[in-house]
């Protein structure tokens, strides 16, 4: 017996049914999910604010990390907390006390610039999310992206997809380094000829 927590906004996952007394608990933006969020507001690089609904209960939470994807993470956490019997106050406190680990959406602020450090074990989804967040920053927005590893036979296509996404984002400069990132840089430039794209084959360059 138990539960499995799934993203109810995923067309494939939403089809999962109870199996061997394992009950699916869905989270997402649809009010048909057991745990859902709405009234989502971006606070720029400071984070996100949203209302989380747990059954007949709703509460507002300030997520201290930016990006719409962090709302999904908060909803998943709320679903797990609810399963384990935490109160809404405890769930809210846990989400609002979140601290990023090194390499995972960590903000490094200096007197001249702000670095969004999301370099640990990057993947296409995390890179696209980082680019989306970068758009909310003030001043010049510079993305420095490297090769993504362990992507298998689709590695070239996946780097191109990130490049296309970068080309559509409101950023000022894209710097790509690494052999696979050549595909990313070329696709970004084709997608947005006005974007300043710099490519270096290795970090030493």
Residue ranges and their predicted role:
Residues 101-103, 120-129:
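Glycine-rich phosphate/pyrophosphate-binding beta-alpha loops
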Residues 133-142:
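Glycine-rich phosphate/diphosphate-binding loops that line cofactor/substrate pockets in enzymes
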Residues 177:
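Conserved residues at the C-terminal ends of beta-strands
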Residues 128-131, 155-166:
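Charged helix-capping and loop-helix junction motifs
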Residues 10, 120-122, 150:
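Short, glycine/acidic-enriched loop or turn micro-motifs at the edges of active sites
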Residues 1-115, 139, 164-167, 171-173, ...:
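Acidic, Mg2+-coordinating active-site environments of NTP-dependent enzymes
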Residues 196-205:
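Short acidic-hydrophobic, aromatic-tinged amphipathic segments that line or gate anion-handling sites
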């Amino acid at each position: 017996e138990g539960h499995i927590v799934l993203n109810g906004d995923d067309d494939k996952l939403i089809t999962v049914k109870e199996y061997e007394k394992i009950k699916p608990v869905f989270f997402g933006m649809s009010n048909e999910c057991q745990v859902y969020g709405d009234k989502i507001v971006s606070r720029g690089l400071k984070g996100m604010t949203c209302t989380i609904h747990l059954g007949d209960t709703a509460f507002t939470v300030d997520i201290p990390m930016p990006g719409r994807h962090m709302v999904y993470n908060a909803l998943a956490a709320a679903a797990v907390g609810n399963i384990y019997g935490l109160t809404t106050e405890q769930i809210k406190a846990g989400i609002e006390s979140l601290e990023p680990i090194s390499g995972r959406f960590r903000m490094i602020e200096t007197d001249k610039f702000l670095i969004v450090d999301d370099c640990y074990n990057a993947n296409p989804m995390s890179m696209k999310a980082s680019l989306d967040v970068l758009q909310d920053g003030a001043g010049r927005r510079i993305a420095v992206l490297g090769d993504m590893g362990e992507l298998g036979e689709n590695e070239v296509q996946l780097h191109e997809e990130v490049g296309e996404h970068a080309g559509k984002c409101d950023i000022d400069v894209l710097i790509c380094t690494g052999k696979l990132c050549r595909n990313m840089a070329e696709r970004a430039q084709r997608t947005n000829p006005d974007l300043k794209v710099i490519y270096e084959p290795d970090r030493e360059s």
